[in-house]
Amino acid sequence: MPASRTVRLIRLGCARNDVDAEELAARLVDAGWRLTEAPSADVTVVNTCGFIEAAKQESIDTLLEAADGSTRVVAVGCLAERYGAALADAMPEATILSFDDYPVIAQRLEDVLAGRPPAPHTPRDRRTLLPLTPVDRPRAAAEVGIPGHLGGPRVLRHRLDDSPVAPLKIASGCDRRCTFCAIPSFRGAFVSRPPADILREAQWLADHGAREIVLVSENSTSYGKDLGDPFALEKLLAAFGGVDGLVRVRVTYLQPAEVRPALIDVIATAPHVAPYFDLSFQHASPRVLRRMRRFGGSEEFLNLLAEIRRRNPRAAVRSNVIVGFPGETEEDVAELGEFLRAARLDGIGVFGYSDEDGTEASGFPEKIPEQEIRSRVDDIAGIAEEVTADRARARLGETVDVLIDGVDDDRPDACYGYTEVQAVDVDGVTVLRDCSAARGALVRAEIVEIDGVDFLAAPVTGSTAGTPSGATVEG
């Protein structure tokens, strides 16, 4: 291959997609491709998102924008996997690749440049690629080619940024059948990665600049159910204490109905685990949740929150909710609002319902008009803003560990970063005044001021206690 071959990788969507993009980057670099951010690259690969309508539109807009230049455009990721040939027909400007093409991505791009792009795939339900019985899946998964699941002594990953925070995939797919969600159809059945592979990748990430690792999957509380160990996630989290160079690990995508006491204990109390619970409540009305084919309701969720805070009153809780689900009444919306006020969550994402192709809910009657959905979203988002701001104010005076990510653009004498109760990209940030710490440093500080959900903090002098994995805290 000529040395001049260049490729631009554009990442859209969630942290799981970021992991997949870094696998693609590693494969391309291994094959001699040079990564660039220039729009004039020989090929632009867009790692698309296909989750909800807004994300799909962003992916399409990004593909069209890239196609305006001289570069060849290739679509990978969830939108490409989900729609395949139909997307190719609608968008002849781009070559559409499947997850199955990832192991041979370099050859596929060579074919595109040579004028022989591969024929687009016909989408299939990827749940059918693995056995129905979970314990039979890990061995079969090696033959399927699941993105981000490679094992072996060498980590196939190339970091695309120098952030001190890095995502790490512990599982893929989902066995739940939520009526609003299409993800299992194109991400497949749930399958866990072996703990040894995860820990090897964690050490590699730490060796390449990561100080905090964020564990991602479609459903992290199911981790290990196919490995024959109901406490596999608890053991995995404990094992991260032995990864040299890490200051903390954060676990995301927890299903409330699957959260167990032992898991609460390790997340709430282990010194190297962020006391942070990312719980996908989705709603609070039991009636709406049943139609979503989910479990629980206000009472069960509040009991779970009480148990978390009994173990660690400082623990942070984040969740997402869907407003405007078919059949949702004004009483259901009121119950959701009351729940959010009582729950005192640290972070809340509010989404308006939209029909997704192939989902059960898309065929439900009693659809809510779009204008009414927007109105309900505005109402719940207003409550969410009040609740999260109140929760942030309650942290005034707390001592936290701030992982420094950079220098504040508005204040050269200040740094910004994230505490143990703030996840990068989805929660607020902490601005640390009078700070000269380097990126990746962990600084003990006191929260002295609140701005919405953001913290202003001051370093605590003379404090260096309590850091995991041999790391130091500056103060």
From Swiss-Prot:
Domain TRAM: 393-461
Catalyzed reactions per annotation: L-aspartate(89)-[ribosomal protein uS12]-hydrogen + (sulfur carrier)-SH + AH2 + 2 S-adenosyl-L-methionine = 3-methylsulfanyl-L-aspartate(89)-[ribosomal protein uS12]-hydrogen + (sulfur carrier)-H + 5'-deoxyadenosine + L-methionine + A + S-adenosyl-L-homocysteine + 2 H(+)
Sequence intervals crossing the membrane: none
Main location group: cytoplasm
Matching InterPro entries: Elp3/MiaA/NifB-like_rSAM, Methylthiotransferase, Methylthiotransferase_CS, Methylthiotransferase_N, Methylthiotransferase_N_sf, NA-bd_OB-fold, Ribosomal_uS12_MeSTrfase_RimO, rSAM
Cofactor: how and how many bound: Binds 2 [4Fe-4S] clusters. One cluster is coordinated with 3 cysteines and an exchangeable S-adenosyl-L-methionine.
Subcellular location: Cytoplasm
Gene Ontology CC, one term: cytosol
EC annotation from Swiss-Prot or TrEMBL: 2.8.4.4
Binding site for [4Fe-4S] cluster 2: C174, C178, C181
MTTase N-terminal domain location: 5-114
Enzyme class label: transferase
Protein name: Ribosomal protein uS12 methylthiotransferase RimO
Annotated source species: Acidothermus cellulolyticus (strain ATCC 43068 / DSM 8971 / 11B)
